[in-house]
Regions:
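N-terminal binding-site loop/beta-alpha segment at the start of enzyme catalytic domains
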Residues: 1-77
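Conserved, mostly hydrophobic/aromatic
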Residues: 6, 18, 36, 51, ...
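Acidic (Asp/Glu)-rich catalytic clusters
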Residues: 8, 67-75, 98-105, 156-158
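Short, well-ordered coil/turn segments that N-cap beta-strands
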Residues: 11-16, 47-49, 74-77, 106-110, ...
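Short, acidic/polar
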Residues: 30-43, 89-104, 148-154
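A short, structured active-site edge motif that brings together acidic residues
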Residues: 76-88, 111-115
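CE4/NodB-like, metal-dependent polysaccharide N-deacetylase domain
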Residues: 93-113, 132-136, 157
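Beta/alpha (TIM)-barrel catalytic core signal, keyed to glycine-rich beta->alpha loops juxtaposed to Asp/Glu
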Residues: 117-212
Length: 212
């Protein structure tokens, strides 16, 4: 498995990243915990060292499952998780991080994303709190997900963005217009979600496929 540097950080992430949305059980049909644990073990055996999760994936269930599966190998892995909208106020950022660390059985998070921009909390509050936690060593890298270019520029007024996570695939290429060039110019890493078009690009769907 190839490894790449994550933007300007010292983190080395695998070229393929294991996602865990389905492991939360509330989207995409769900998955049995045993199957999820086996999938994580299979990823490790094939050289994947980076795992992406979030509180909203089963209200913490995917984080808890991942934390248990990575016991004993935590120091060899890169864990990505995300701050949900309810935890973006200044006084909620650190508790939100600490709750995620507890579920993941770790005392630091390698990459901590703002999952979605808030409609009510000024980004200055969230970014200032995240920068403090990064300075304290509790976060290795700060990311933003589902941000527009203007929202990224506003966030950068108050801190660092090490990585972005937009939806991006051969079918969904809107970031080519402005976000991707900006990220490249500023050495901001890009970890896309849904790179296989939520299954459409896997080759499993043939002409005449019936969607239900």
């Amino acid at each position: 498995m190839g490894m790449v540097s994550l933007g300007k950080t010292k983190l080395q992430v695998s070229e393929i990243i294991q996602g865990t949305w389905v492991m939360g059980k509330d989207y995409w049909g769900g998955a049995e915990d045993r199957e999820s644990a086996e999938a994580i073990q299979c990823a490790l055996e094939h050289g994947i060292n980076t795992f992406d999760t979030a509180y909203i994936y089963g209200k913490g269930h995917a984080e808890e499952l991942l934390g248990e599966a990575l016991r004993g190998v935590r120091d060899k892995c890169v864990i990505i998780t995300k701050l949900w909208k309810t935890d973006m106020a200044r006084e909620r950022v650190q508790p939100g991080l600490e709750e995620a660390m507890r579920r993941l059985q770790t005392d630091y998070i390698d990459v901590f994303f703002i999952h979605y921009p808030s409609e009510t909390v000024p980004i200055e509050e969230t970014m200032t709190a995240l920068m403090r936690l990064k300075d304290e060593g509790k976060i290795g890298a700060i990311g933003v997900s589902n941000f527009s270019l203007e929202q990224m520029k506003e966030a950068l007024r108050f801190g660092e963005i090490d990585v972005i996570q937009p939806c991006y695939s051969l079918l969904w290429r809107f970031i080519d217009r402005d976000i991707l060039p900006f990220a490249i110019e500023n050495k901001i890493a890009v970890i896309p979600y849904s790179p296989l078009g939520q299954g459409i690009l896997t080759g499993s769907m043939q002409p005449g496929h019936t969607f239900r």
